[in-house]
């Protein structure tokens, strides 16, 4: 994971040095100052960028340079939580007591989702009934889609399909939605067939690089394009064209990353094995 993070963070550092980030001005035009304006609005330091890339994002969730890196801490440390649970409680009768205690401990953290995902994959008495109930799985599929689409920023949902949901549970809607959706997909052959089409397999292949790159493209090229073209074409048409261009550029850069950057992880691992 680290080599790709490092390469992209170096690109972000250079973009900041060159003054290519125009997200603050674009946020004013788009009316999204509350979320989009504050990213990368500081003087970059090569040393702090290295710290974030090499260990900060994995151990502490540091994401000053690349805002999306906060999830890597959850995935990295969360995996060790799952490994520990599997080693200590796998197949044992008392595991549900341990699961309940861990759930309470993690209740107000972002690790709750990855822990519940592990629990969902373990064996339990009535799991087979849930897996084989087609109607219930389609219902979970629909419910999962609904909750996964809850506005991620936690605001701007008034008057939408999600406006009826109490704000007090905002931190749990996506977790609940993902659990329902993934469980349903694992048990619905027709959905699996649809998601097995080449376009989805390709997006899965480039997903890691695409995730790390997309915000860089949006905050630099996307913001510049919006500010430059909007006075000529109007807001709506400019945003539509911008969406297409951002998507093409992001996918293209992700493909290059998959071919030439991500393999560095394998080479680094092989080198360490030889030592």
Residue ranges and their predicted role:
Residues 1-8, 86:
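Alpha-helical transmembrane segments of multi-pass membrane proteins
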Residues 76-103, 123-134, 231-234:
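Solvent-exposed interhelical
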Residues 208-214:
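Histidine-centered divalent metal-coordination motifs
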Residues 109-202, 216:
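Alpha-helical transmembrane segments and terminal signal-anchor/GPI-anchor hydrophobic tails
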Residues 5-76, 80, 180:
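Membrane-interface helix-loop-helix regions
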Residues 64, 68, 164, 168, ...:
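Hydrophobic, aromatic-rich alpha-helical transmembrane segments
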Residues 73, 97-100, 112, 176, ...:
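Hydrophobic alpha-helical transmembrane segments
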Residues 7-11, 15, 117, 121-132, ...:
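C-terminal "closing" transmembrane helix and its immediate cytosolic amphipathic cap
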């Amino acid at each position: 994971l680290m080599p790709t993070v490092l390469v992209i963070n170096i690109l972000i550092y250079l973009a900041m040095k060159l003054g290519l980030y125009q997200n603050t001005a674009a946020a004013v035009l788009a009316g999204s100052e509350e979320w989009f304006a504050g990213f990368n609005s500081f003087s970059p330091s090569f040393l702090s960028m290295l710290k974030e890339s090499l260990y900060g994002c994995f151990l502490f969730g540091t994401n000053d340079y690349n805002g999306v890196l906060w999830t890597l801490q959850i995935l990295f440390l969360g995996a060790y939580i799952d490994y520990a649970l599997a080693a200590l409680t796998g197949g044992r009768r008392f595991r549900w007591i341990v699961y309940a205690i861990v759930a309470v401990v993690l209740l107000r953290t972002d690790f709750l989702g990855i822990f519940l995902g592990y629990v969902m994959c373990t064996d339990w008495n009535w799991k087979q009934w849930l897996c084989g109930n087609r109607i219930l799985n389609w219902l979970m599929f629909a419910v999962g889609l609904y909750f996964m689409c809850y506005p991620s920023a936690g605001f701007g949902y008034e008057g939408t399909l999600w406006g009826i949901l109490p704000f007090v549970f905002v931190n749990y809607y996506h977790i609940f939605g993902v659990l329902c959706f993934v469980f349903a997909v694992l048990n619905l052959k027709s959905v699996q067939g649809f998601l097995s089409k080449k376009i989805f397999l390709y997006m899965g292949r480039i997903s890691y690089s695409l995730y790390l790159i997309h915000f860089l493209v949006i905050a630099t090229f996307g913001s510049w394009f919006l500010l430059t073209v909007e006075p000529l074409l109007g807001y709506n048409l400019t945003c539509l064209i911008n969406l297409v261009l951002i998507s093409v550029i992001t996918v293209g850069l992700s493909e290059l990353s998959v071919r030439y950057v991500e393999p560095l992880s394998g080479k680094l691992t092989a080198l360490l094995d030889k030592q």
